A protein has these predicted regions:
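ATP-binding glycine-rich loop module of kinase domains
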Residues: 2-33, 40, 71
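Helix-rich C-terminal or lid/interface subdomains of diverse kinases
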Residues: 9, 56, 66, 148-221
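Non-catalytic scaffold residues of the protein kinase domain
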Residues: 9, 45-48
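Active-site beta-strand-loop-beta-strand hairpin of nuclease catalytic cores
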Residues: 14-18, 121-129
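A glycine-centered beta->alpha junction motif in the catalytic cores
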Residues: 24-25, 57-78, 91-97, 189-204
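Conserved kinase catalytic-core helix
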Residues: 42-46, 69-103, 109-112, 117
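Short beta-strand micro-motifs within the conserved protein kinase catalytic domain, predominantly
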Residues: 50-58
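Active-site Asp-x-Gly
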Residues: 124-166
Length: 221
């Protein structure tokens, strides 16, 4: 098994057939349980890896072929990748998990870490082969995922910010107003600052997220 690229929180290894994801950090057990539950419920409805086995801190998943969204984005395919990310996100947000989703409070299944960072695509067709990394999934406002995908592009792929129009076109709705998106980005950054603070109080991760909060707060539409 070799360590898989683009894992940012946990320890994820694979051999081309299966993937072992071992959860690290605060709430590791709950995040593993959450990811397992969502993957099981979404199987056959959204492209997600199959769950083969669940141990206390590890999930064994089927390996899904595809190229990581961030690699394809940097290879010059930003419009196609972001359009596919938008279309896949719409499918996620219209899933009815149980009687509570789609209820009149407007909450949907929020992925919780959505963006080209957690999507694999077929490099020939740009079809999404898998949406990965459901450990932060919850019921919430669709803007959370819309804003976070935008944040990933603004922070890590600033040359492609203009292609976010393809993301919203793929999703099929005009972008929510900028102040609402920016507030959602800042809320998520603060939640991640808090997560790193619980993991290693006063550590590099905390400083990193504080810096990112300052940067995000300075952005204009
Ligand atoms: N089922 C899978 N098939 C193929 N690659 C995977 C699979 N699961 C994870 N990966 C690869 O491992 C990386 C890290 O997995 P992920 O669930 O995103 O963990 P993390 O929470 O650490 O980001 C992914 O970005 C992807 O490149
Ligand atoms: Mg990930």
């Amino acid at each position: 098994m070799r360590r898989l690229p683009h894992g940012y929180t946990n320890h994820t290894v694979g051999d081309g057939t299966v993937v072992d994801k071992t959860y690290a950090g605060p709430g590791a057990r709950q995040r593993r349980a959450r990811e397992r539950l969502v993957l099981t419920r979404l199987r056959g409805r959204i492209p997600v890896p199959p769950v083969h086995r669940a141990d206390e801190l590890t999930l064994t998943l089927g390996f899904v072929p595809g190229v990581h969204g961030q690699e394809l984005l940097d290879a010059g395919h930003a419009a196609a990748v972001l359009s596919a990310c938008g279309a896949a996100l719409r499918r996620i947000h219209i899933v009815h998990l149980n009687a509570r989703t789609g209820a009149e409070d407007g909450r949907v299944l929020v992925h919780g870490d959505y963006g080209p960072n957690n999507v694999l695509l077929d490099p020939a067709t740009f079809e999404v082969t898998a949406v990965l990394d459901w450990e932060f999934a919850h019921l919430g406002d669709p803007v959370e995922d819309l804003a976070w995908c935008e944040w990933i592009v603004r922070m890590h792929h600033p040359a492609h910010v203009g292609r976010l129009e393809n993301f919203h076109a793929g999703y099929g709705s005009p972008a929510p107003p900028w102040p609402v998106r920016k507030a959602a980005m800042l809320a998520r950054c603060r939640a991640l600052e808090d997560f790193t603070q619980r993991w290693a109080p006063g550590g590099d991760g905390v400083r990193h997220w504080r810096q990112r909060i300052t940067t995000t707060a300075s952005w204009e539409e």
